[in-house]
């Protein structure tokens, strides 16, 4: 046992050096807490940053977009607009459907938003149409968020109506009950119903009208309370055969008598079991199917939700007939898991590379083991804190830990290198550990808190980008803090027990060769540094030129928002001429599906035609293209999209818009392309004037591609122009006309069949097979006040007009959305600037407002705050360094290293062809924290040499640079190798990680080369400035 004199120091490390058992057990506790925390952490693609979003859907079959807007959407919007915490309200009113999406502030709990929405719907109930089949239905889901899982249900033996009924009652309800599921939608529209197709000629010949038939059916099928009898000894409940359950029963229904003979419904109509809406259809690949899309609630854990669904599926499918097949077509968690696995592999690779570089420099196994223990201990211990903060294992937190690998080893290296230096001088290991740890303690604290200071501004970033990177910043900060603790406790304790003069002097051939190599490098550096110190102004001009170059590169580098990921799923919109019918669109969709399924990268395809909560019009179709796993296809998603669009261009009469699904979804509506730009006006007429003009100009811009608009005002309308005087004379009201038209052509839901498991509708319509098109209007008959039958054509003229296929609102005002993509040779920043320049040339009137939406709006917000974010990081670090050094000047010397990092990062991004996006910006901010450590280590030792050894500033900084060259080089290479796996990543999610790695590797290389020479020069210049300032003050005091 080594006996130390009472004067031996050690600073905060002394207690831990002297108590190895307690220190070891403390570290074991940290390790166990981290392991337990890791097992408890959920897995997700990104941190949960969803806006609280609620979608309200109201279906009113047969209603035109104009009727849906005025009668359904507008009353609801007026009530929703009064809710507190509402960030944005958008709506889409199309034929028979109103979809309102409510996006709330990030700080508002989703449950509170749900209560407000329910209260608003209740308040608007009396303002909605009295014949609305169902009240508005809300769901806690973002419609723009792609489904976490898509399932297709098919059968070769059963009709789709039966399949849909079983899926709805046996499968969908159970999945909806799983925690985290926000909405389960069934696409395909094959819900069972009894369809009554009236023969217009038959009822006209009998002097009947469709209203007569409707009244007879609704009166014959009821399900209401009948009471009970309560006698002296027993009670009897009353029941009756008041319901009709099958199509056969409806055929036998007597609707009227003529000459004493009954007229049954089957005499004047075709009554059959069919689908509630015959203008809806879905396909899985080429087979008609019921497609089940499962969307998560905002904030729900996607992995655990998907796992729960998969665990329940076998049990659910067992309840279905054997002829029914359930297929999982897509599962987003597959790619999420693959991405997280790849990131974890890169983390392990970074740890291995860092340990390797430590051994290369220390050339000693015991000395390598010490940081080899410190690195995983610091990283694993971080998991325990992540659990308490409700974080998850996701790409960003794992990226933070990967980058932290290079950071956390720095502290251990600095401590080991300093203690080893004293052991090599002949001191006992315990004494060397106490002396070296005590001497280096302030440096460790400076490195730690100045690095954490850089991360502080990230915590104050607003909106969704700030939420996104909060987990990243805190995870990295926690790892750095734990590393500092380990370096001041475990590392010096292990050095005192594991290092010795013999172990450090023991050399093999590799050790001797590498030692000579390092000696030659240090000698060459010393000669170069001496020359540089003799030309300070030239060196200063180089430093200033890097600052100017970094500003120029910042201005001219292409800028983006968030890397476009390859998640293996493509969302598509198929657009046909505005007058296309359901049958025509279904045929076009099948043609396109045939082309898409021939592509070698495509694994499966689901498609949907019809109007519902996601598809606004009959002339459009929704597609979801599921690609093969990344390792089973040759091309990334962007190349696949380009190939598919080229192939589909050969299909006449359709336009295909494709975009890859992303883990980060900011939009609130399903769009055709990745980016959106809106025009908002006080009237539809203003939009009809200016949208075509702007579209024409935008489509000519090379910075944009796939430019399209949701403005469709050429939908065919048969306008029934009623002569009100003639109608009034015959006792026919406008309500009679609307009812007659609705009965004939609205797929009107006139009655409900109640069963124990579900409810089914009775649908009334005219059989138009023999009278297609506008000729069907000639068959409409109305009843006059004297009981006669009057043809509609006798009181009305039919005019063919055009009208919008859908009417969109943003915050209650008409709006149109222009969607666009960005070509490969341009950036989002280029596109945004081109749109803004084009808008200025149009001189839009004051009642037209424009705004970017979704990720484009977030890009503008992030770009505007980026400069201030970097300034805040620099200021925060200056304040921390100024406090630690009790100096106004030394922090400036340290911060002078920053421009070199910026130049290196921006040059690397340019060379790699990467955009300056939010991921790359985070890398630059981290570089601010990394590169200043070189200056800190130099200045700490220079100040100590001046103070304790009486050296001149020049000699002190020169010796400090030579003395700290090896740990500086070692820590820089460790940080570089920690970022290298991210830069070289090629697996799933590599697009997200690569910009961070590229920027950091480039910044570290350039800064390492330059700061070794510029920092000493700037240190001496500021020293001279301080002396000159002191002399001036002294002179003024003497004169005073």
Swiss-Prot record:
Keywords: Cell inner membrane, Cell membrane, Membrane, Transmembrane, Transmembrane helix, Transport. GO terms for biological process: bile acid and bile salt transport; xenobiotic detoxification by transmembrane export across the cell outer membrane; xenobiotic transport. The keyword Lipid metabolism does not apply. It is found in: Cell inner membrane. One of its GO terms (cellular component) is efflux pump complex. GO terms for molecular function: bile acid transmembrane transporter activity; xenobiotic transmembrane transporter activity. The keyword Thylakoid does not apply. It is a multi-pass membrane protein. Part of a tripartite efflux system composed of MdtA, MdtB and MdtC. MdtB forms a heteromultimer with MdtC. The MdtABC tripartite complex confers resistance against novobiocin and deoxycholate. MdtABC requires TolC for its function. This is Multidrug resistance protein MdtB. It comes from Escherichia coli (strain K12).
